[in-house]
Amino acid sequence: MAATIIKNGLIHDAVHREAYVADILLADGKIAAIGGGLTAPADAAVFDADGLEVYPGFVDAHTHIGLDGYGIGYEGCDYNEMNDIWTPQLRAIDGINPRDPSLADARRAGVTCVCTGPGSANVLGGTFPVSYTHLRAHETSQDL
């Protein structure tokens, strides 16, 4: 995977109190360096973010994404099991549709990680897995 450098973006992160202008070097899909005046390999893709703001991926800590039957209908809804107020045996991982278009919608909006699960209507609704919003076509909910 070729390197990518984001130049001159106004960076917001969890470390600094104030946003600051800097470059971000990405290598092998990970942040390799952040700082001013970074240089990248000759084959690196360069993205000029001058005048743009750069944020880390957002985390949605409580959602039903992938479980709500989006695009399928009611039969695809795998949350809020209404047969009991106590449903600790429910596992969201068993009901997540990895091809749910709302995963791509969330990713485009900057959400990179979600905690999705059943049971907002239940006192104890089941387990919530934490997963990324990116998937390839061949992957399953177990690969999230």
How would you label these PLM feature ranges?
Residues L52-P118:
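Metal-associated gating/positioning segment near the N- to mid-region
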Residues D143:
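Cationic, low-complexity basic patches in intrinsically disordered or flexible, solvent-exposed regions
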